[in-house]
Amino acid sequence: MIKKFDFLIIGGGVAGMSYALKVSQSGKGKVALVCKTSFEESNTSKAQGGIASVTNLIVDNFDKHIQDTMIAGDYISDPVAVEQVVKGGPAGINDLVKWGVNFDKKENGEFDLHREGGHSEFRILHHADDTGFEIQRGLIEA
């Protein structure tokens, strides 16, 4: 049996799955998502750290995050790419939350942000010590 799709996405980690969800939800066509093992076995699911994103504009901003990233990259990172990724971070976090990913929160409902190496502010979103597993779980269920 021949199956026809408008989009073929190869890779079942956060990049492939999030793109598949966006395309599918846009209604622009049928999506096929393939991976070499199972969706639960992606590299994303093994990531333990967190995701850096500006979420609290009272104490943090894009310029600080860009500067931290350029310093951590010994100023050889492409500044245009760094700016694009940093400024796109909040929208990416919003998408993950919309798709059901649960990041740790404080009692007041705000994200429980951490500060890790290379960051001058608390901007690391996480889920216990298995952030990647939680992201993958949320994407699979979405």
PLM features per residue range, with description:
Residues 2-5:
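Core beta-strand elements of the Rossmann-like FAD/NAD(P) dinucleotide-binding domain
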Residues 7-33:
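N-terminal Rossmann-like FAD-binding beta1-loop-alpha1 element of flavoenzymes
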